[in-house]
């Protein structure tokens, strides 16, 4: 079963520019892990940056959910660099997606997932399948992968209580976006990484923490 975990705060905040691990943890093991750089780490906001070309490390199977879906695309992040925003305690993160050719802001991508759990090496979460896509300069959103989520719920990958909490989280953030009351500052769409924040190629220990 997946866990809808609460944010833990027993570890100190990470400094700007620190390289930390961002992982999806399934059944007590990393399903996918990759290094990111810290942009902000406060009680109200955690922001990390995933650079183009960064190494992706996939957990050793088998997993009840099967291999991580990014696996067929290789062990490097091939899209443009992504800023990921998370409000501690919320069950989603917001990814700032840019055009791979021009670098222009393209859309907000709301990734519904377990609230980030702080670890000694970074942050742990688990994707909950549902996504919301919000094009630049628009409050019109598109729901994505709802059918995949409902299938996981049907076959028991989420308990009934977990499934209800996930649906509620997705609906809540959708309402906030429609009302123009999203929690994140839209000026993050203009944020640029410092020069030199190139691909990260280190991996982290695969032991749970």
Curated annotation (Swiss-Prot):
Annotated source species = Streptomyces wedmorensis
Q: Which InterPro entries match?
A: DUF402, FomD-like_sf, Ntdp-like
Which Gene3D superfamilies does this one have? FomD-like
Reactions it catalyzes: cytidine 5'-({hydroxy[(S)-2-hydroxypropyl]phosphonoyl}phosphate) + H2O = (S)-2-hydroxypropylphosphonate + CMP + H(+)
Pathway it acts in?
Antibiotic biosynthesis; fosfomycin biosynthesis
Please give the activity regulation comment for this entry: Hydrolysis of (S)-HPP-CMP is inhibited by CDP.
Protein's job? Involved in fosfomycin biosynthesis. Catalyzes the hydrolysis of cytidylyl (S)-2-hydroxypropylphosphonate ((S)-HPP-CMP) to give (S)-2-hydroxypropylphosphonate ((S)-HPP) and CMP. Can also hydrolyze (R)-HPP-CMP and cytidylyl 2-hydroxyethylphosphonate (HEP-CMP), which is a biosynthetic intermediate before C-methylation, but the catalytic efficiency is much higher with (S)-HPP-CMP.
Query: Which named protein is this?
Result: Cytidylyl-2-hydroxypropylphosphonate hydrolase
PANTHER family per UniProt: PTHR39159, UPF0374 PROTEIN YGAC
Q: What taxonomic lineage is listed for the species of origin?
A: Bacteria, Bacillati, Actinomycetota, Actinomycetes, Kitasatosporales
Q: Which GO terms describe its molecular function?
A: hydrolase activity; metal ion binding
Q: Does the keyword Manganese apply?
A: yes
Keyword vocabulary terms for this entry: Antibiotic biosynthesis, Cobalt, Hydrolase, Manganese, Metal-binding
